[in-house]
Amino acid sequence: MWNGGWLSVDKPMFNTKMVRTLRMNPKLILNVIYSFFLNLFHSIRSFYRFRVFADFGSTITRGSGARLIIDRRLYLGGKYIGDMVHSKSSVRMYRDSVFHVMGRVKLGPGVGIVTGPGAMLSIGDNTYITASSVVYCANRITIGRDCAIAWNTTILDTDFHHIHYPDDTENELVKPVQIGDHVWIGCNCTVLKGVTIGDNAVIGANTLVNKNVPPNCLAVGNPMRVIREDVEWKA
């Protein structure tokens, strides 16, 4: 409880819960200490509330002018898929980029977030990315709220390289990606530049998303195709 500027706690209840938690997960002490210094270093803390809670070894790297905006809390790490993934999550922000965490967002172990120079990435409240996934934002990527993004998924808004054609034209290097609210993306998917995925859509495992997906649709395959409409899913 926050009372008159002082932090007050029901001590017997607090001690009992803390002892039980530490017995079940002794690594928690290390993670709490590490999270404290991570928040302190990036100046994203208040006295009694961590904005970032991270497993030991998870990293946040910011270039000059990069801004990490956290409305509520960003979780880095945790246990997913039976604790089979042990690599650490990372956030790397190049100069003048913005990563806006619009609520509570969870990035699982092995998840890598990269925002290129001047890029803007936003992720909505109650969205999680499970494990070993990559989000590379060179320009603009928006992920809505209540989304579930499974392991080994890649989301890109860039081709990385120019492709020149015989008629003296070339590919458009970057295009924004828009993922709506309450979208479920299965494991091993790739979402390419310029794609919009509508609200409540479901993307099946191993799908290459290279074109728009309407709301409330089930899309699968490579090449991707919509196989069901008016679908709903629950977490």
Please report, for each region that a protein language model flagged, where it lies by residue:
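Domain-scale signature associated with acetyltransferase and cell-envelope carbohydrate enzymes
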Residues: W2-L156, G180-D181, D199, P215, ...
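Short, flexible, glycine-rich and Lys/Arg-enriched loop motifs at helix boundaries
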Residues: D83-K88, H161-D168
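Beta-rich strand-turn-strand
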Residues: Y136-R140, N188-A201, T207-K211
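Conserved catalytic-core motifs of eukaryotic protein kinase domains, centered on the activation segment
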Residues: D159, P166-D167, V195, E229-V231
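Flexible glycine-rich beta->alpha loop in the catalytic core of nucleotide-sugar glycosyltransferases
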Residues: F160-H161, T207-L208, P214
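Glycine-rich NAD(P)-binding loop of Rossmann-like domains
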Residues: D168-I179
